[in-house]
Design a protein with these regions (language model features):
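Generic, well-ordered alpha-helical scaffold segments in large soluble proteins
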Residues: 42, 63, 67-70, 92, ...
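A general structural motif at alpha-helix termini
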Residues: 60-61, 217, 262, 273-275, ...
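Alpha-helix capping and helix-loop boundary segments enriched in small/acidic/polar residues
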Residues: 105, 110-113, 157-164, 168, ...
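Conserved helix-loop functional segments at active or binding sites
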Residues: 146, 183-186, 190, 219-226, ...
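Acidic, glycine-rich loop-and-beta core segments that form the ion-binding/anion-interacting portion
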Residues: 217-305
Length: 446
């Protein structure tokens, strides 16, 4: 069995080991590729300051590339008795290269190593989330344009209120995603700073070149203060979680709308039959399980910032093992949100809308405000017009036109989808994904 990196003469109690390692081996598989990338940058820097020879660097880089390929293929495993991904990589290098493999940890602690891994993993995941959000955004904008002239009831307090349109409905969620992407961009900028070189949280007496590793890894800048670099553990995850929760909040609300509008009592939209499920007892059922599960998953994701906060909020400066637990709730969250985005994008592209909803007599009063406004435009004081229409409704004498006259920005007749699309493009252009991709490919020689 492999010896722990920190193990000396005292044998570790097996129950203590099981408890302290917890789910780390499982969670660290998310980080394997990124741990290798971080090590490649670190040893390249070590060679530049004389702690590795050029020949040692070449041997280590070649073997790290092999480990990276194994991780890409899903073949990387953390062996029993090995605590984490960092220990496993060092063990594999030492088995293959002997004492050379033992040199890669110079000037580094597992504290800054895992923090680096988390940042490399997170920024890659943010890129995938941003791309998925952008895909959903474009579907919603296209549907908004396609159905911009199709009216639907607008509700307040779940009571019939005023005319709306499918153009407004689809477009509203598109614009909500723009604001969500602002949160994601802020999270990315916080994430895209280099903590490597902070070691255990107090730096190193080795003459490390942190600017070099920042460049090699494609970070925008450093976490300069080594104490703050470690204080950022938990804070970075929490702020990214806020961004994920913001997106999840939009998707959850959209899922609720879709479930409700798909029901027979509303009948505004129809989900594709192949996206619904049946009942074991009621043969007529077509249940919107996909959106119900999406709603639940997104509601769970909205609790993520609070979970992280409760783990990290009462810790003083310095590293504490409490932070390990954050990985268990944080790392799987990205795939869960990506799944929800993928399902929502597919269904929103295929959803059918009822183009004749307002022909139903129960929506007669939805045009009352239009009638009030018509009278006001003709010169009647607004309050008098409001009272007249209200009395007509009470007396059962209300008559109306189904024409709507909304021309201001963002209304039924002027959706401003081009402006909303421009806002989204501005946010998308603000992510520096290209820099990180170029840097990582250069390290891998691809």
């Amino acid at each position: 069995m492999a010896q722990k990196l920190w193990e000396k003469s005292v044998q570790v109690n097996k129950d203590i080991e099981r408890f302290t390692v917890g789910h780390d081996r499982e969670m660290d598989l998310y980080l394997a590729k990124h741990d290798v990338i971080g090590s490649m940058a670190h040893i390249t820097m070590l060679e530049s300051i004389g702690l590795l020879t050029k020949e040692e660097l070449e041997l280590l880089l070649e073997e790290l590339k092999n480990i990276y390929v194994a991780a890409e293929k899903g073949e990387f495993v953390i062996e029993d008795g090995v605590e984490d991904v960092h220990s496993q990589v060092e063990l594999m290098l030492t088995r293959k290269l002997g004492d050379i493999g033992k040199k890669i940890h110079s000037g580094r602690s597992r504290n800054d190593q895992v923090l680096l891994d988390l940042k490399l993993f997170t920024r890659a995941q943010i890129k995938e989330i941003a791309e998925a959000v952008e895909q959903l955004f474009h579907v919603l904008i296209c549907q908004s344009e396609r159905f911009k002239d199709v009216l639907m009831p607008g509700y307040t307090h779940l009571q019939i209120a005023m005319p709306s349109s499918f153009g407004l409905w689809f477009g509203a969620y598109a614009e909500s995603l723009v604001d969500d992407m602002l949160f994601l961009q802020a999270a990315f900028k916080m994430c895209n700073r280099n903590p490597l070189g902070s070691a255990a949280g107090y730096g190193s007496s080795f003459p490390l070149n942190r600017t070099m590793t920042t460049r090699l890894l494609g970070f925008d800048s450093l976490n300069y203060n080594v104490v703050y670099a470690q204080m950022g553990r938990g804070k970075m995850e929490r702020n990214v979680a806020f961004a994920l929760a913001s997106i999840a909040g939009t998707i959850s609300k959209l899922a609720f709308d879709a479930c409700m509008f798909n029901s027979q009592n509303f009948g505004f939209v129809k989900l594709p039959d192949d996206c619904t499920t049946g009942s074991s007892i009621m043969p007529h059922k077509k249940n919107p399980d996909v959106f119900e599960l999406t709603r639940a998953k997104c509601n769970k994701l909205q609790s993520l910032p609070q979970q992280i906060m409760m783990i990290a909020n009462n810790l003083p400066s310095g590293y504490f093992r409490d932070l390990q637990i954050i990985k268990e709730v944080f790392l799987p969250a990205f795939q869960e949100l990506k799944d929800c985005l993928q399902m929502t994008t597919y269904i929103m592209n295929e959803i059918k809308v009822n183009e004749h909803i307002l022909n139903d007599d129960k929506y007669l009063l939805i045009f009352s405000v239009e009638e009030v406004n018509r009278l006001a435009r003709e010169g009647m004081p607004f309050r008098d017009a409001y009272k007249k229409v209200g009395l007509d409704i009470e007396a059962g004498n209300f008559s109306h036109s189904k024409q709507v006259h909304h021309t201001h920005e963002g209304s039924i007749g002027n959706l401003c989808n081009d402006e909303i699309s421009a806002l989204m493009q501005e946010v998308v252009d603000g992510f520096n994904f290209h820099g990180m991709e170029v840097a990582e490919k250069a390290l891998l020689g691809r």
